[in-house]
């Protein structure tokens, strides 16, 4: 989805000199990371002040432990995406979101033990490379001001040449026990008021910028945290506000959630914010079940050899994704097909226009994945159940699955 903020509103323009909140004394630019304007509470109300934005100087023992744990986790072998047997609906939804992040993420619901988490985490190997500014906690894009952190934006305005490196798109796991401060980031209020320095420690949303944020068991996450995640995913920005001091930074990420419907459903308002919805069921075919068990046993026995056996398929799929991302802008969808998509949404009483927008985007992403520059009726038929089923109003007396209702209405309108 398009960002609701422009670079001008996201971070105020830089000034030649930075000043302390309490005095007019300039702050040292060597200690400053970025200039940000803030409203400071005083006896006479609020006044404006200029602050420096920086990371907390010395990481705590907890942060160092977390970093070490993250390094160990990255060394763990990941099950190859190409080796996942079945679950084509879930895999397609994930691939389409990687090709076009503006689809708005995917919610995966299904039985326990069906490979939801394994499939999502296996996506890591297929993610394309991106250019990022070296040492920036927000994974800033050196060429796009809208996805630059405040420090990088300030350096660009000063004409500094930024060191750039190519890195893989990151996937960040959000644990169920995460606090709001850990997710959004924290501001050291005492340091801000006494030293005039806005010491900001970025959270998981900053780390996930230009990447993927995965929430396992999202239906068990606190509602207010889900609201924060969905708002950031929709707007592309995260704002942290404490005691009248606020910081905004880019937070553009693909939100992927998974859960078991037996443990509780998400509120309809929250479900609607996910671009696509995939249903995962237990494989019933005996031959497929045996194949899954055997493949898993091979992976557990020798992960390295197992991954190497799928290297060619993985490379082919990665090239296909990279090509689709490059050609996505050239894909066209006929006006008549757009009208029919909107007619399906209207006749299904889908609230709002998110269903129309996401269906158009997903159909174009699928056409790009197949190497075409024109959307066909078959493309729309493939993606429309995943784009609309979670947006239908639930009728307790209705015995037909919502996905089947979408399919029935699709063929009624398109034939």
UniProtKB/Swiss-Prot annotation:
Pathway: Porphyrin-containing compound metabolism; chlorophyll biosynthesis. Redox regulation; active in reducing conditions, inactive in oxidizing conditions. Thioredoxins f and m mediate the reversible reductive activation of oxidized CHLI. Keywords: ATP-binding, Chlorophyll biosynthesis, Chloroplast, Disulfide bond, Ligase, Nucleotide-binding, Photosynthesis, Plastid, Transit peptide. It catalyses: protoporphyrin IX + Mg(2+) + ATP + H2O = Mg-protoporphyrin IX + ADP + phosphate + 3 H(+). Its main location: plastid. Coiled coil: none annotated. Residues 1-67 form a transit peptide. One of its GO terms (biological process) is chlorophyll biosynthetic process. The keyword Disulfide bond applies. It is found in: Plastid, Chloroplast. The magnesium chelatase complex is a heterotrimer consisting of subunits CHLI, CHLD and CHLH. Involved in chlorophyll biosynthesis. Catalyzes the insertion of magnesium ion into protoporphyrin IX to yield Mg-protoporphyrin IX. The reaction takes place in two steps, with an ATP-dependent activation followed by an ATP-dependent chelation step. This is Magnesium-chelatase subunit ChlI, chloroplastic. The gene is CHLI.
């Amino acid at each position: 989805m398009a960002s609701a903020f422009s670079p001008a509103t996201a971070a105020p323009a830089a000034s030649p000199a930075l000043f302390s909140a309490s005095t007019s004394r300039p702050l040292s630019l060597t200690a400053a990371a970025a200039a940000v304007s803030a409203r400071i509470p005083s006896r006479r109300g609020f006044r404006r002040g200029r602050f420096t934005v920086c990371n907390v100087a010395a990481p705590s023992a907890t942060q160092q432990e977390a970093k070490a744990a993250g390094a160990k986790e990255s060394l763990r072998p990941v099950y190859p995406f190409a080796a996942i047997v079945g679950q084509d609906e879930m895999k397609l939804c994930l691939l389409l979101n990687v090709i076009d992040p503006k689809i708005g993420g995917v919610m995966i619901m299904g039985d326990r033990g069906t490979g939801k988490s394994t499939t999502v985490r296996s996506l890591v190997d297929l993610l394309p490379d991106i250019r990022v500014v070296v040492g920036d906690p927000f994974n800033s894009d050196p060429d796009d001001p809208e996805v630059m952190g405040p420090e990088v934006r300030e350096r660009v305005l000063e004409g500094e040449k930024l060191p750039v490196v190519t890195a893989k798109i990151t996937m960040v796991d959000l644990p169920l026990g995460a606090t709001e401060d850990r997710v959004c980031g924290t501001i050291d209020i005492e340091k801000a008021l006494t030293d005039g320095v806005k010491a900001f420690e970025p959270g998981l949303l900053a780390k996930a910028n230009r990447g993927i944020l995965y929430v396992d068991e999202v239906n068990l996450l606190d509602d207010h945290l889900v609201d924060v995640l969905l708002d950031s995913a929709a707007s592309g920005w995260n704002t942290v506000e404490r005691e009248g001091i606020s910081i905004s930074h880019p937070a553009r990420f693909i939100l992927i959630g998974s859960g078991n419907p037996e443990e509780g459903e998400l509120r309809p308002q929250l479900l609607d914010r996910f671009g696509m919805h995939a249903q995962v069921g237990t494989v019933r075919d005996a031959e497929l079940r045996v194949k899954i068990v055997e493949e898993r046993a091979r992976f557990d026995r020798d992960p390295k050899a197992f991954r190497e056996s799928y290297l060619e398929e993985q490379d082919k799929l990665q090239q296909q994704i990279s090509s689709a991302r490059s050609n996505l802008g050239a894909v066209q969808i006929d006006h008549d097909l757009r009208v029919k998509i909107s007619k399906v949404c209207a006749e299904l009483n889908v609230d709002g226009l998110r269903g129309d927008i996401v269906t158009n985007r997903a159909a174009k992403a699928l056409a790009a994945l197949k190497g075409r520059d024109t959307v066909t009726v078959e493309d729309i038929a493939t993606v429309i159940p995943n784009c609309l089923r979670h947006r239908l109003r639930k009728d307790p007396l209705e015995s037909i699955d919502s996905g089947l209702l979408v399919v029935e209405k699709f063929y009624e309108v398109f034939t």
